Regions:
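Exposed, low-structure sequence patches enriched in small/polar residues
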Residues: 1-369
Length: 369
């Protein structure tokens, strides 16, 4: 670290090496890479705020066993973070960045892999790069006198990849094949959360709502288009602490998701689901905790047809001392054998049942050291 004009300049260097060996029934694929990262950052501080500029540079050398040539990339990812305390109660944080990331996590493979009994994927055999531009703004408010706080967040992301996966769904198998053409995904997101503590009533109330918009390219069975889908979520939690031996907590949440008409579907495909849970903790005597919780979720499977899933659990715990404790739990008292969910995954609607083990009873003795 250095001091320039009264502000810190920090230099960092990271070196990383990774060797991959991927086995398949037909062949073995080996690949390796060296990653050199230089991370300079400069921060300017003043009363109530600061700004930080980061200028990381990555140099990647990638080799694979089936090709003599080596791949190498130089990637530059600048970012700027700004923080300002606007007033005693209000704080603002904003950032902009342009990130370039090489695909160092997934190993290369120059063939077709079998993922499960019917899904196959043609491997990515070259170094790919994802370029991400982003900007976000956050406002935070905190009043310690009225015990009220809120946070507002707005974010935008534009991600460009040098390849995309083309999918082929057939009666006997599913195949994913990479296509080396640039494709872009755009995301807008907004969120609001707030919390209020009513001291005299012993009630802690919190809530949040968020909205997101996504635009993503999909290629499926030789049909291609951009999907535009939306999601809206809201939740409220209330907790009462008026008694030391009884503490209830209620949570309610709801979701609405919809997808704009495209070549895959001519309707908005609106789906709704809701959830609520009630948790009750009892402390009748010192060191003993009894609890019970009930939850119920409602999923819209198709238009105006819903699946209702209800669960009830109960249990107790007794602390003998700071090291020893015993507990007993009963889960899934309604003895449900499965529950149903539905969702959209890109262009496809999924509706399935998740198997459960039914009612369970467990006793445990714990020792902490």
């Amino acid at each position: 670290a250095f001091n320039i004009a009264g502000n810190p300049l920090t230099l960092g260097y990271i070196i990383e090496y990774k060797h991959n060996r991927l086995y398949d029934t037909q062949q073995t694929a080996t690949s390796s890479y060296w990653l050199h990262t230089l991370e300079p950052s400069y921060q300017i501080q003043w009363s109530g705020g600061n700004v930080e500029l980061l200028l990381p540079v990555e140099y990647t050398i990638y080799r694979c066993g089936w090709r003599k040539e080596k791949d190498q990339k130089v990637l530059f990812s600048p970012s700027l973070d700004f923080t300002q305390q606007i007033s005693y109660l209000l704080r603002m944080e904003t950032s902009v960045a342009y990130n370039q990331n090489a695909s160092n996590d997934d190993p290369w493979f120059n063939g077709t892999m079998m993922n499960n009994y019917r899904t196959f994927t043609t491997g990515i055999d070259s170094l790919s790069v994802q370029r991400v531009a982003l900007a976000n703004l956050r406002l935070s408010y905190l009043n310690t006198i009225t015990l009220f706080s809120w946070n507002v967040y707005v974010g935008w992301t534009r991600s460009t990849s040098d390849h995309y996966l083309k999918s082929l769904y057939m009666p006997d198998y599913t195949l994913f094949v990479p296509v080396w053409n640039d494709r872009t995904k755009t995301t807008w997101s907004m969120a609001l959360s707030c919390r209020k503590n009513f001291r005299n009533a012993h009630i802690n109330l919190s809530g949040q709502t968020n909205y997101s918009y996504n635009k993503e390219f999909v290629s499926q069975n030789e049909v291609e288009d951009y999907l535009r889908y939306h999601a809206l979520h809201a939740s409220v939690t209330a907790q009462w602490s008026g008694l030391t031996w009884f503490q209830p907590k209620l949570t309610m949440a709801g979701n609405i998701s919809w997808k704009k008409p495209d070549v895959f579907s001519v309707t908005d495909n609106l789906l709704k689901n809701a959830y609520y849970s009630l948790t009750m903790d009892f402390y009748p005597i010192s060191k003993l905790r009894l609890y019970a919780d009930f939850s119920q979720s409602v999923f819209e499977i198709v238009r105006n047809h819903y699946s209702i899933n209800s669960f009830l659990n109960a249990g107790m715990r007794y602390d003998f001392n700071s090291r020893w404790s015993a507990s007993a739990n009963i889960n899934n008292l309604f003895n449900r054998k499965d529950y149903e969910v539905s969702l959209y995954q890109r262009a496809n609607f999924q509706y399935y049942r998740v198997p459960l083990r039914g009612r369970e009873f467990m006793i445990s003795l714990r020792f902490k050291y």
